[in-house]
Amino acid sequence: SSNLGAGYVDNSGPAGLSQSLVDNYLNADGTPIDPADGIFKDFNLTFKGRDGRLLATVMHSNCKFKSTSPESKSKAMLVEEYSEENKSVVRPPYLTEGGPARNATGYHIRMSIDTTYVSGQGETSLPMIRYAEALLAYAEAAEELGKCTPAVLEKTLKPLRERAGVTYADPSEIDPNFTDFGYAISANLQEIRRERRAELALQG
């Protein structure tokens, strides 16, 4: 489909996911990343050993979709420059030209793309509220009221992280690379907010 060929963007103008969102996702072992680590300058290594929700949200190498190309029913996203000759392949960010096909940040959106169609029409569900959102709201309310015990987090954060393939550990230290809100927050609240962003990114 045309939107896959250009990268999934807002039809009215350039779009893209932020570096801040990509950095928000933990490593699979439950530790936060250090954005200053040179390993994250490599596009492919950015996704290695990370929270499974990062891979479900952001386009990365080897994402496969139905293709309009007659010689193949499935093509992987290729790490190469955009070319007018091969418009049916999902390719890395189209950064150098103007228009609605341009990706403004370098990170394509993968979430909610229907990978089964090729004609420009497809359907994806749009949940109004998710169980995960209820768990996170409960955890945050408990923290704000001073009632967020390890038992609360084991019933709220832990199942969400484990479902995404991330090792869970009780929050104990502040991540110095986390978003600075301009005021101090607890380690619990930091991880609840991280989890909300990771779990509900692009879902309204």
Region locations from a protein language model:
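Acidic/polar-rich alpha-helix caps and helix-coil junctions
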Residues: 1-19, 23-204
